[in-house]
């Protein structure tokens, strides 16, 4: 893989992993553009591309760790302190808040995993046509627009329960549909459950950590099954990793800026324009979708 292609794919991953617009649609567009230029790309299901996807996913994990480091550090300290206090009570009085949040996060991931493993193939088959992607992009824009019009939310961390965690986890699972965005779905439905904007953002992106780890593990298993590719170069992997991490930090901070100020609708105009271009054929996804 050429270094400039690795850098470009790292940029796409870093931007659209966090912006509330579809990463799938943009990866397809990028691959289509590269193919139209006469560039040779390995098939998406090849060991080379799976390994590259694994590496850039880890790069976006670094982005989350950098941006949310203060919150992650606070969470860890409070979890350790709460566990010590809970043990001192002999395990009485219920789980400490931060341990409860940890297990609720795992429940969200479980909901995502069950839905994803059950319906992923169906989503990719039924929703992989350009017209269906245009439809899911339009839905994303509507949800983002509606989110900005919601009254101020009042639910804090203590208000997160199994129902809230389940709703957010299922929303993340439905984001496997081509044209839907993981960050958009989790943030939007977190707000719909009543979470304040700050906690909706933090829960959404904290949830991305175990989700990305699980996806990375599945990708690693697939690479092992297919055999480590000989055609992928360390330099291309390194470039993709570094670019995805740096660009991811910028895009993550941008999302937080707009979310806190109830301005996610600026992304609505973009995804609607993209949906219109795909629906009318001005943007042709058919060759890349096969």
From Swiss-Prot:
GO molecular function: undecaprenyl-diphosphatase activity
Topology of this chain in the membrane: Multi-pass membrane protein
Catalytic activity as recorded in UniProt: di-trans,octa-cis-undecaprenyl diphosphate + H2O = di-trans,octa-cis-undecaprenyl phosphate + phosphate + H(+)
The EC number(s) this enzyme carries: 3.6.1.27
Principal subcellular localisation of the protein: membrane
UniProt KW keywords: Antibiotic resistance, Cell inner membrane, Cell membrane, Cell shape, Cell wall biogenesis/degradation, Hydrolase, Membrane, Peptidoglycan synthesis, Transmembrane, Transmembrane helix
Lineage top rank: taxon: Bacteria
UniProt entry tagged with the keyword Cell wall biogenesis/degradation: yes
Matches recorded under Pfam families: BacA
Gene Ontology terms: cellular component: plasma membrane
Spans through the membrane: 1-21, 49-69, 101-121, 126-146, 160-180, 203-223, 232-252, 266-286
BP GO terms, sorted: cell wall organization; peptidoglycan biosynthetic process; regulation of cell shape; response to antibiotic
Subcellular location: Cell inner membrane
Keyword set includes Protein biosynthesis: no
Function statement: Catalyzes the dephosphorylation of undecaprenyl diphosphate (UPP). Confers resistance to bacitracin.
More about this protein: Bacitracin is thought to be involved in the inhibition of peptidoglycan synthesis by sequestering undecaprenyl diphosphate, thereby reducing the pool of lipid carrier available.
Similarity remark: Belongs to the UppP family.
Protein name: Undecaprenyl-diphosphatase
Provenance organism: Alkalilimnicola ehrlichii (strain ATCC BAA-1101 / DSM 17681 / MLHE-1)
């Amino acid at each position: 893989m050429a270094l400039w292609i690795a850098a470009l794919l790292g940029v796409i991953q870093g931007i659209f992993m966090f912006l509330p617009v579809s990463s799938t649609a943009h990866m397809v567009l990028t691959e289509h553009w590269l193919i139209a230029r006469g560039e040779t790309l390995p098939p998406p299901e090849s060991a080379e591309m799976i390994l590259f996807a694994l590496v850039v996913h880890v790069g976006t994990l670094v982005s989350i760790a950098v941006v949310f480091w203060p919150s992650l550090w606070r969470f860890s300290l409070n979890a350790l302190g709460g566990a010590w206090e809970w043990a001192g009570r002999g395990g009485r009085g219920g789980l400490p808040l931060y341990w409860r949040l940890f297990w609720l996060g795992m429940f969200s991931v479980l909901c995502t995993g069950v839905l994803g493993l059950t319906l992923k193939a169906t989503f990719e088959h039924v929703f992989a046509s350009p017209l269906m992607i245009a439809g899911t992009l339009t839905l994303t824009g509507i949800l983002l627009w509606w989110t900005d019009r919601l009254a101020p939310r009042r639910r804090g961390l203590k208000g997160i329960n199994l129902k809230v965690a389940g709703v957010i986890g299922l929303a993340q699972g439905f984001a496997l549909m081509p044209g839907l965005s993981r960050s958009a779905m989790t943030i939007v439905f977190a707000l719909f459950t009543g979470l304040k904007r700050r906690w909706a953002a933090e829960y959404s992106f904290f949830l991305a950590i175990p989700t990305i780890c699980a996806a990375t593990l599945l990708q690693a298993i697939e690479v092992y099954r297919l055999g480590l590719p000989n055609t992928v170069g360390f330099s291309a992997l390194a470039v993709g990793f570094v670019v995805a991490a740096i660009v991811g930090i910028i895009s993550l901070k941008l999302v937080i800026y707009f979310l806190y100020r109830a301005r996610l609708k600026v992304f609505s105009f973009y995804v609607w324009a993209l949906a219109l271009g795909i629906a009318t054929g001005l943007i042709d996804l058919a060759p890349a979708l096969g």
